[in-house]
Each structure stands twice: as C-alpha cells, then as structure tokens.
C-alpha cells in the first residue's frame, strides 16, 4: 500500500477537510493510488502477458493470481488497495474466458486476514497484546482466528492441480475463515 493512497480515519466528517493532520479521501494522490494499482493490477497483468504466451496449447497450464477479500468487502482506510484487488479479481475472470479455448485455466486466491511480518505492527501492540483492529477482525470472523500459511498453500495446490481442479477456471477462492 502507499501512505498517499490511505486515509487516516474510517469515517469521514466535514471537519476533516480543514484538519491538516487528517488524510481523507480528498487527499489521496494520483501517485499514491497509481503506485498501488501498478503494484497489484499491472503486477498481475504484465507477467501474465509475458508468461501466458508460452502456455498456449500446452497441457496442464494455469495461472493463479492473488486477489484479496478486500475485493469483496473493502476495508476502511485503503480504498486504492481494495480497488486494485477488485481489478485483479475481474481480470482473473476475464482471462479465464479469454484463454478457455487454448487450454489455460485462470483462477485466484483471495486471502482474508493472515498474521505476517508485514502487518504485525497493525495487529499487535508493542507488548504483544492484540490491537483494537485485531479484536475487530477476530470478532467479525466466524472462525475467530487469523488464517495459517498452510491454509493458503493448500488452496493454492488445489487450484493449480490438474487432477483436482481441471474443470475449474475463473474462480476467485476466498480463504478467509468466513469473514
């Protein structure tokens, strides 16, 4: 993500326009939003253009993209990321149809919440206790926990398997504990 594509608060109020310490929707920059779209959407489209050429007409070829549950349920503060991941999901479904006659399956995984080094500071206080954001996420997740990396791996292996998923294309698979 980019600080120039992220808002400070979950909800906008009219006083936010005059507060220089608050980044609102109106303060998002073209550069910040562009960075997020370039990283996520073009970071999916351009490699697909390059590598799919070699897959045409070959047995067992498939493309697996990485979307996000943000594509379905946008989180507060990160509109550019949610929009970019929606674009990845849409591209996945479009590519599935586009490549269907040349033997290339195209699917995506849509991870929900997983505790990683990248988001640890947002999820845990310095003393290791969960942040208010973590509690909100866990309370909104029916399975009441974060996902485990092995669960991402299992879903990935399923979708790329010619034995298990040879008739599956255009699917964006949620891996989210019911969130």
Model region roles, listed by residue range:
Residues 7-45, 64, 88, 143:
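Catalytic Tyr-X3-Lys loop
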Residues 48, 84:
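Active-site helix of classical SDR
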Residues 53, 97-100, 166:
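Alpha-helical segment proximal to the catalytic Tyr-Lys
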Residues 68:
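Residue(s) in the substrate-gating loop at a strand-loop-helix junction
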Residues 72, 110-122:
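Short, flexible catalytic-loop segment of classical short-chain dehydrogenase/reductase
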Residues 73-79, 101-102, 144:
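Active-site loop immediately N-terminal to the catalytic Tyr-X3-Lys motif
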Residues 74-82, 94, 122:
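Active-site loop-to-helix junction immediately N-terminal to the catalytic Tyr of the SDR YXXXK motif
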Residues 145-175:
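C-terminal substrate-recognition "lid" of short-chain dehydrogenase/reductases
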